[in-house]
Regions:
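Bacterial Sec-dependent N-terminal signal peptides
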Residues: 1-28, 199-206
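Outer-membrane beta-barrel channels and translocator barrels
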Residues: 21-23, 60, 110, 122, ...
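Hydrophobic, lipid-facing positions within transmembrane beta-strands of outer-membrane proteins
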Residues: 28, 47-53, 99-103, 157-161, ...
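Surface-exposed strand-loop-strand hairpins of Gram-negative outer-membrane beta-barrel proteins
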Residues: 35-54, 184
Length: 206
């Protein structure tokens, strides 16, 4: 039994050493995964691909700053109803394509396990509404329906909070982005709500 505990202790020490970084280390991390998004009045959450790259600088063994670029397809799904209970058509997808610039402070509570929070400016590069084989430009639809009374914001600001775990350079990152910017210029309180889960591999100092 003593040998078993000794072996387990050695394994834990080895894993911790593999995930340890030193002050001054710099890593670059390609990332790919999934985003799960909605907006505050959306009927259903929408699943899409997220991908990008992140740079991380270690100010100390337990503290680092990270910044990067992540491309996400956000938005939501709606059901089409003819009355309260009956669905009469295919679901509608609202696709909001963003280039995001997440900046986070990371605190390693254990070797490889980090809590993170920060700020994320994002820029919408495209938006469309899809139903079946039909695809329409979302900004043109809003302009045709509302005229100049309503404008869609192309800039979005959010607060990312989450955690990550690294093992042998492979990192699993999960975060939730709290939307701060209204999607429209009118009085509606419409905000993005996004979960992002990605896998990455840290290149550089280990």
């Amino acid at each position: 039994m003593k040998k078993l505990f000794l072996l387990m202790a050695m394994m834990v020490t080895t894993i911790a050493a593999q995930a340890q970084h030193d002050e001054g280390d710099i890593t670059i991390q390609p990332r790919v995964g999934l985003s799960y998004s909605n907006i505050t009045d959306g009927d259903k959450w929408k699943l899409n691909i997220a991908y990008g790259v992140e740079f991380e600088y270690y100010l100390a063994e337990q503290f680092s700053l990270a910044g990067g670029v992540l491309f996400t397809n956000q938005g939501c799904k709606y059901d089409v109803y003819s009355d309260i209970n009956k669905v009469t058509g295919e679901g509608i997808k609202l696709n909001l394509y963003y280039g995001t610039l997440p900046i986070t402070a990371n605190y390693y509570i254990l070797p490889g396990l980090a809590l993170k929070a920060g700020i994320q400016p994002a820029f919408r590069v495209k938006a469309n509404v899809v139903q079946g084989s039909e695809k329409l430009d979302f900004d043109k639809m809003v302009a045709a329906f509302y005229g100049n009374d309503v404008k869609m914001n192309k800039f979005d600001l959010s607060i990312p909070v989450g955690l990550s775990y690294e093992f042998k350079g492979v990192t699993l990152d999960a975060r939730y982005n709290i939307g701060l910017t209204k999607l429209t210029s009118d009085g509606d309180n419409l905000y993005n709500k996004v979960f992002v889960v990605t896998l990455g591999y840290k290149l550089g100092s280990h």
